């Protein structure tokens, strides 16, 4: 797998990322894309890692959070420092004032990296 640096950030990432939009299949939009369960997600993660693809893209808005939960189960037991998990932090997740943007990020979440 070819890797490149993300802008001037010094962060080295693979040229490909695996998207988890099909994980969960909840809601009208995401059920139309697919409904990958945990067992299938584990199989897909294995295929990615065998090919050297270590970056997985998800978002809390994918299938109402189910995609992130399924990805978490699929990578459980793997060395976390060997994986890159990207997400979105600007979409509205609910109606509350703190349910949008980076304000809701927990203590284990690193600040966004700008590609510039």
Name these PLM-found stretches:
Residues 1-84, 91-93:
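N-terminal binding-site loop/beta-alpha segment at the start of enzyme catalytic domains
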Residues 27, 33, 96-116:
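Glycine/proline-rich, positively charged
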């Amino acid at each position: 797998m070819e890797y490149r640096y993300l802008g001037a950030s010094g962060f080295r990432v693979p040229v490909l990322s695996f998207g988890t939009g099909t994980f969960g299949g909840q809601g009208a939009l995401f059920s139309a894309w697919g409904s990958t369960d945990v067992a299938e997600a584990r199989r897909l993660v294995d295929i990615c890692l065998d090919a050297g693809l270590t970056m997985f893209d998800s978002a809390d808005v994918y299938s109402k959070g189910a995609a992130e939960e399924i990805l978490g189960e699929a990578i459980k037991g793997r060395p976390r420092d060997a994986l890159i998990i990207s997400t979105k932090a600007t979409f509205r997740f609910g109606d509350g004032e703190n349910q949008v943007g980076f304000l809701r990020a927990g203590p284990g979440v690193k600040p966004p990296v700008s590609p510039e």
